[in-house]
Amino acid sequence: MAIITLTSDWGTADYYAAAVKGVILSQLPDATLVDITHDIAPYSIAQAGFILRNCYRNFPEGTIHIIAVETIESDVNPHVVVKAHGQYFISTDNGIFSHIFDDGFEEAVFIDVEQDTDFFTFSTRDRFAKVAVMIAQGAPLSQIGAKRERLNDGGVFCATVKNNIIEGIVIHIDAYDNLITNITRKRFDEVGQGRDFVIKVKGDLYTIEELSESYDDVDPLDPVALFGTHGYLEIALNHAKMASLWGIDLRSTIQVVFKEP
């Protein structure tokens, strides 16, 4: 039985997700369809990549993931299928794959499958769903399109380092209004080398000078910074909504300033 997931920035008020599911179920009535989320911020491939990165390994081998964020195709950003870790990812090659996995992929192909309509505004329904059905029915990737040797890099969304400063952005705000940044533990340790630091939010308006292991390491309503199981720097208010109270949005700048050695 095929397992097919959907990740999109459509929200839940419109018909888009239902239309895609209908196309799939009309051909695979026994398929298991999983909504990972439809609440990705519009066009945020960094957020979509973060969500998928932290859940796809929990799915069984052979799972097919449809990613409907920034799906417009171009010569630079073609539609592709990528096989990695025994699973299949159908998306536009817009840099998202470098956010999902950073240890390579098994195979990638261009999608050379004709749509059943003359419209090009809903490729997730008219193309991605069709490809998902083909894969679920056992079609080899070579039947879908020619091999793609390399994938586009989403490095524009990686944290940058200059002198003693790591500058990142907020890539996800969770249901508790906690901020997840694109600053990894690895980069933090490499640059910091154990030095004291100041985490700056909204310039010098809010600062944090230590890492915690738990939200409850600080008093209620106090700010806390930690590295969660996802491996990224997370900033929160204990038992409060940081993003709302501090006026933080996706792509807001976060700095980690290390003291001079």
List the model feature ranges, each with a label.
Residues 86-91, 95-98, 104-114, 173, ...:
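Conserved subregion of the PPM/PP2C metallophosphatase catalytic domain
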Residues 6, 33-36, 67, 89-92, ...:
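General beta-strand structural signal in soluble alpha/beta enzymes
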